[in-house]
Regions:
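Short beta-strand-loop/turn "lid" adjacent to the catalytic site in phosphate-handling enzymes
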Residues: 63-100, 129-133, 164-184, 209-214
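Active-site core segments that coordinate phosphate-bearing ligands/cofactors
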Residues: 5-6, 113-126, 137-172, 181-197, ...
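Short linear loop/turn motifs
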Residues: 205-215, 323-326
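N-terminal glycine/serine-rich phosphate-binding loop of ATP-dependent small-molecule kinases
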Residues: 1-96, 124, 152, 225-226, ...
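Short alpha-helix plus adjacent loop in nuclease-associated cores
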Residues: 98, 102-115, 433-434
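Core-facing hydrophobic residues within beta-strands of well-ordered domains
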Residues: 72, 204-207, 392
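Short, acidic/turn-prone active-site loops that include or flank metal/cofactor-
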Residues: 31, 98-105, 178-179, 264-266, ...
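Conserved small-residue
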Residues: 16-18, 23, 75, 102, ...
Length: 498
């Protein structure tokens, strides 16, 4: 039997899933990674540690009996987007990887936005608004503050592209990742605004060739085969940005399909035939499917809200008990709202000063109501992202949070959409494996996926529909409060001695 391997390079975890030729998952392996976060906005990853984690999960897959009895036909990759991953000619890191959540470039961003019409031109060209997460702005920061690091590098990569280079020895960028802030969405060429107005054209020698997601991108090297036990010369596909790979993996491949990834970032996407600005806070990336783009609303923090809840409110790591507690609370959580902005927000509105918080607590508020309010706050954020789009229809849910049936029902009730979910939730890895199969011409159409549907309950939806305007008004009215808070804290932080 033929097998396909999907590798997903996440922000806090790397995973590999082995699929048979019917795209049934046969084996999986995962390793946690340790991003480094600092108070000054730096968010970085030790690239060598990440590589060792990838090797470890590949060794586990190689030992699986099913693979030893069959043939590994091809490998595909998906990975976290944005960021800057620099290497030398041999693939050795030049400094740590800069992550999408890094905000060190905020002051330079403010300088650029003071140029008349710059953000309008930037959005028209790249399909995204200027934000600190953007690779283009992170490169701009490096050019200003660490030019020696750029001079020492031979290649610029995104996370999964660097891992693929280490696997194959073939340097390449890939279309979906590059479309996030470097490409002109209409022409597919490098953005003239980024290259000329930001002065990054001098960095073009660092950019490897650009490949389509399902293009062949080399084969597994003898050295990596020896380190992992996987067969040498196995074809490796270019792969895709994780949010695009997840769309492919869950079945959001047709115009109008909507999906949400309940992961580190709660990211909602709408598949379009071309950039269609329905909500001004959107950003566009190229889909894995030819001729399509995805209108994205990636929140700054998704499931970390649930992590915070378990650590500080629930005081219980058992998600099953938490689900049972919130299932017993009426929709609306007794009028308590949670604003899910733990680390600022980037979509469906932009505010680096935004912060999370409860609203509406009374002497009668219970712990269970606080707990349910956090889940509802993230569901309201999905409603917020979908303003202006047709109501009803289906909403594909994927990511680690999609394992919670209670949360999926809350989302169905809150959005008024039929939530479509799969018991198998590693759908970004599944998308990567599908791209691998396409790269060796072994797949004519996307294989079906067993799915469960959660229907919105009319009474619960009516209650949430009445509460959503309060949620929206609250975050709009809080914008100046968040800004005032940040301004008040700045002199205090300057007085603190290291």
């Amino acid at each position: 039997m033929d097998f396909y391997l999907g590798i997903d390079i996440g922000t806090s975890r790397v995973k590999a899933v082995l699929f048979d030729q019917h795209f049934t998952a046969c084996a999986s392996a995962a390793e946690n990674t340790s991003p480094r976060l600092s108070a000054n906005g730096y968010a970085e990853q030790d690239m060598t540690q990440l590589w060792h984690s990838v090797l470890a999960i590949l060794r586990q897959i190689a030992r699986h009996p099913a693979l030893q009895a069959g043939r590994l036909r091809a490998i595909g990759l998906a990975g976290q987007g944005e960021g800057v991953w620099l290497s030398d000619e041999q693939g050795e890191p030049v400094g740590p990887g800069i992550l999408w959540s890094d905000t060190r470039s905020h002051e330079l961003m403010s300088d650029l936005l003071r140029r008349p019409g710059f953000n309008r031109r930037y959005f028209a060209d790249t399909g995204t608004h200027l934000q600190p997460c953007n690779t283009s702005l992170q490169l701009y920061w490096l050019k200003h503050y660490q030019p020696a690091r750029l001079a020492a590098a031979r290649y610029l990569f995104f996370a999964k592209d660097w891992i693929r280079f280490r696997l194959t020895g073939v340097a390449a960028l890939e279309l979906t990742d590059a479309s996030s802030s470097l490409l002109n969405q209409q022409t597919g060429s490098w953005s003239s605004v980024v290259m000329n107005e930001m002065g990054l054209n001098e960095l073009l020698p660092l950019f490897p060739p650009l490949l389509a997601p399902d293009a062949p991108a080399g084969t597994l090297s003898d050295a990596v085969a020896a380190l992992t036990g996987l067969p040498a010369a196995t074809p490796v596909a270019a792969g895709a940005l994780d949010v695009c790979s997840a769309a492919l993996g869950c079945g959001a491949v047709n115009e109008g399909d909507i999906y949400t990834i309940l992961g580190t970032t709660c990211c909602t996407g709408i598949v379009c035939r071309g950039p269609q600005t329905v909500n001004e806070a959107t950003r566009f990336v190229t889909h894995t499917e030819a001729g399509q783009v995805i209108s994205l609303f990636p929140m700054q923090a998704g499931t970390p809200n649930i992590d915070w809840l378990q650590q500080h409110i629930s005081l219980d790591a058992d998600l099953g008990r938490l689900e049972q507690a919130i299932a017993e609370v009426e929709p609306g959580s007794g009028g308590v709202f949670w604003q899910p902005y733990l680390n600022g927000e980037r979509a469906p509105f932009y505010s680096p000063d935004a912060r999370a918080g409860f609203f509406g607590i009374s002497p009668h508020t219970t712990r269970a109501e606080l707990q349910r309010a956090v889940f509802e706050g993230l569901a309201f954020a999905i409603v917020d992202a979908l303003q202006g789009y047709p109501q009803g229809g289906e909403l594909y849910l994927t990511g680690g949070g999609a394992a919670s049936a209670t949360w999926l029902q809350i989302i169905a009730d809150c959005t008024g959409r039929t939530v479509v979910s799969s018991a198998f939730n590693e759908l970004s890895a599944r998308g990567a494996a599908i791209l691998a199969a396409r790269s060796v011409a072994a797949l004519a159409e996307t294989p079906p996926l067993a799915q469960t549907r959660y229907q919105p309950r009319p009474q619960a939806h009516a209650r949430y529909a009445a509460l959503y305007p309060v949620y929206r008004l609250l975050r709009e009215q809080m914008l100046p409060v968040w800004q005032a808070r940040q301004a008040a804290l700045q002199p205090l932080s300057q007085d603190v001695q290291p």
